[in-house]
């Protein structure tokens, strides 16, 4: 059938590229963050509140994104463009101000725009490729991982500067200038989405009224297995947010690395996932979601606890790379497991609920992990993230994961 065919992969590839550019900008904040923290002389808790605010905004944006994605399926391109334009305004504001409240407004815009992409994009892919959800969603996340991998070292190089022999000597820009430069690719991507993805959403037979949308959403919320999958996704997001946020600060404040070196370390978190993510998606389509999630989270837990031993040098680098094989890659598998239970036509809402859970259930993790980091340093973060991973393994073990739609 046309919807299940991979002869027409243009939508998957195009949305994956757009997702990659979005994450290129999103990952920039991880490198800019420690410099912003030092520039504004922020405490660990004040710094963590910036990312908590972003998570709350990110979670709340899924509500209108889910509603609009299911009610206006043929306007998907506009929803994706709005996502990119909102992110661009956030980075513009961060680059223009040193006032803490306005910085919060900037990251709130970035968080809102970042998650506003997910419901229309994931929902459209799940509807377009119903028998290959794992692969389609994993390919979309591969685009994100390419952006996450390229973003930090490029942003770090733009800030720190790069010297290669006597031929290339670039002294770098200030982090404020780099923040404003990010406006250009975000706006350009939004415009290109409007031009090239007018067909996104054509697989939908009709648009839902708000009443129909609400009735369908209530059935999703009342499904205990879907709620369990949302919590599982939130636990993974909490691990990712806590670890990546404080790894960057640890590399800057404890190991005294430059922004460029920090960028390369952060890039390792997602580099290996570029290869592992589509493979895991194919395996989950063939053998089921549960074994792929269980194995991935088990290895994540082991690697996280090993940071207690290997906290610098080559050991740290290898561990980050190994963790990167599963850190982000398991997310599309959890999302695909949720999509397996979502009725046709509600893919946008199912995606939105997943990301609302990731953002809102995990929104306290930056603050909690900030308190832990202030008292126990990076060792405390490793234990905190490792315990959440073990809890996720237990939850996954008891959650039924079977296609019902």
How would you label these PLM feature ranges?
Residues 148, 344-378:
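A late C-terminal transmembrane helix in Major Facilitator Superfamily
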Residues 284, 289-337:
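C-terminal transmembrane helical hairpin of 12-TM major facilitator-type secondary transporters
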